[in-house]
Design a protein with these regions (language model features):
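Alpha/beta hydrolase fold serine-hydrolase catalytic domain that processes acyl esters and thioesters
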Residues: 1-23, 27-69, 90-328
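Gly/Ala-rich beta-loop-alpha elbow adjacent to hydrolase catalytic centers
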Residues: 74-78, 82
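Short glycine-enriched nucleophile-adjacent loop
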Residues: 82-91
Length: 328
């Protein structure tokens, strides 16, 4: 398992000799390291992350030492690496790839979809996601998915141990849960509205705070959630103005989009209140009391213009989605 904090990389792979003329190349998904999780979110704004570079080279080397057929597979980020690495091989290697399995794996950056390499292998890919999938619907994909009946809900279904099996096959369903569909719409609209540059700054800032606290794994946060959240906000308010503003603005936009998508799906004939999110200076009020922090924040005219710009882009995207769903 190759973890490089400087490069923001977490990568692992293994090769199995399945039959005399067939090999399986398996890419590991994200482990519990914070570096690995940060690298995952880099895929929202970058068309190439360090683990993908390693995956391309690993698959190339395995193909060079073996003349038979290849199958490529992976769970979560490993599934992304499987498809991405296959798409970036020479055509001669791609012709030897029989199947690509993506198990609840995020898609790819939108810039990859139109490449010749991706188009040559996409028909060989199989995609499986649980009924309440979150990770498996992230980013873009042209691979149809199979929905697996699963236990638990939300992110807990990401573990394949939660997927239901009957005899020698997965139990398949016809539809995703409503929560999965809404989360998918939210994340895709959010990453479409926010520029790649702002997404990079947002995630760099978000993870920087946890690294400064000495967090090494997501389990550190999970088992000490309350303590780390308090430290997170303390450090956030001590950051320079630009970083603090991007963290609040882009994060707030995510929640606003989620709320509005949920509101638009309601079929009941009751009046639903409009969510009006506060401006930055209203959002960050002074906290008082034991174990609390006191902060002040002044929003500049430029920051407010940027905030309104993103709100306008979101409204335009929402209108385009409605028009596409209900053409005249």
């Amino acid at each position: 398992n190759d973890i490089d904090d400087e490069l923001t990389k977490q990568f692992a792979a293994v090769c199995y000799q399945w039959e005399e003329d067939t090999r399986w190349i398996i890419f590991r998904g994200t482990d519990e390291s914070l570096t690995g999780w940060k690298e995952d979110f880099m895929m929202t704004y970058s068309d190439l992350i360090p683990a993908q570079t390693d995956a391309i080279e690993y698959l190339r080397k395995q193909a060079a030492t073996f003349s038979g057929m290849l199958n490529v597979s992976g769970h979560s980020k490993g599934g992304n690496l499987s498809l991405y690495a296959s798409a970036m091989q020479e055509e001669a290697v791609q012709n030897r790839i029989q199947q690509i399995y993506c198990w609840d794996a995020p898609g790819v950056h939108r810039s990859i979809l139109s490449t010749k390499g991706y188009q040559r292998v996409v028909s060989k890919a199989k995609r499986y996601i649980p009924q309440d999938s979150i990770v498996g619907l992230m980013l873009e994909s042209q691979v149809p998915y199979h929905i697996i009946e699963s236990q638990g809900s939300g992110i807990s279904q990401h573990s394949a141990l939660m997927w239901n099996i009957e005899e020698d096959h997965f139990i398949e369903l016809k539809e995703l849960t409503k929560n999965s569909q809404l989360t998918d719409q939210t994340f895709k609209q959010w990453t479409e509205v926010v520029s790649d540059e702002d997404l990079k700054l947002f995630f760099d800032t978000f993870f920087e705070l946890f690294f400064e606290m000495g967090v090494e794994t997501v389990n550190d946060v999970y088992y000490n959630f309350r303590m780390y959240m308090q430290k997170f906000f303390e450090k956030a308010y001590q950051m320079d103005t630009e970083k603090r503003e991007i963290l609040l603005r882009v994060g707030r936009l995510l929640f606003q989009i989620r709320y509005e998508i949920w509101r638009d799906t309601l079929s009941v004939s009751v009046e639903i209140p409009t969510l009006t999110l506060p401006s930055v200076e209203e959002l960050v009020e002074s906290w008082t009391g034991e174990h609390r922090i006191s902060v002040t924040y002044e929003s500049t005219e430029e920051n407010e213009e940027i905030r309104h710009y993103y709100q306008d882009r979101q409204k335009q995207k929402k209108l385009e989605m409605k028009q596409a769903k209900h053409p005249k």
